[in-house]
Amino acid sequence: TQGMIGYWLLQAMQNALPGRQVASMVNQTLVLAGDPALEHPTKFVGEVYTRDEAQALAATRGWTVRPDGEHYRRVVGSPAPQRVIETRLVRTLLQAGAVVICAGGGGVPVIRNTHGKLQGIEAVIDKDLTAAVLAEDLEADALLILTDVNGVYTHYGTPHAKQIPRATPTTLRALNPPAGSMGPKVEAVCRFVELTGDMAAIGRLHDATRIIQGTAGTIITPGGSYGQPNDLQPPQPAAGGPERA
């Protein structure tokens, strides 16, 4: 994710913003070695196998395998992100005016071993939760989770579906969104709003500017409101100064 997709995003941003410095980084994300999620694997990774192949790999390599459609795949734990190791470097690049692409796929999971050294582990970190942690540490003005739907809906997938334009963390969590799709996005924006008191939003990629203006997406704030949309403008970098994340 960080290599191939990072390269695609890097090139697209360079073509869209000629003259602007763009950096794509490989990041490590710190997790707790004792996180209970590591003992309860849920995330599919790697290739697909037949049942016999999967059982043989489970026996020889100690993997946990589960059915995935007609085949079997390995599953690993998804521990909660604590912080992105390279946060200071990301901040330095942002202060220099660069556009930074980072924490793809949630980052490479690492722990601190008994000697205090970083050590990689086999796990998958939720990318939305990592984005929330990084945004908080960078003191970002807002967290936008951009996807392929207009926002968060009640009764999604039914004739009664209705988009939610404004919400608080409490009202959004009460919807109990599916754990494998919208759930992590909702939890990420709720955590960011609760910890910072700032705005977060979920919406369509092409609506990013309108979301900042308050006219699109689902916007989450502590009080469930976001100023007067007509008076809001996308944040601009100060003349001669750094651009906020």
Please tell me what each predicted stretch does:
Residues 1-245:
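C-terminal catalytic "cap/lid" subdomain
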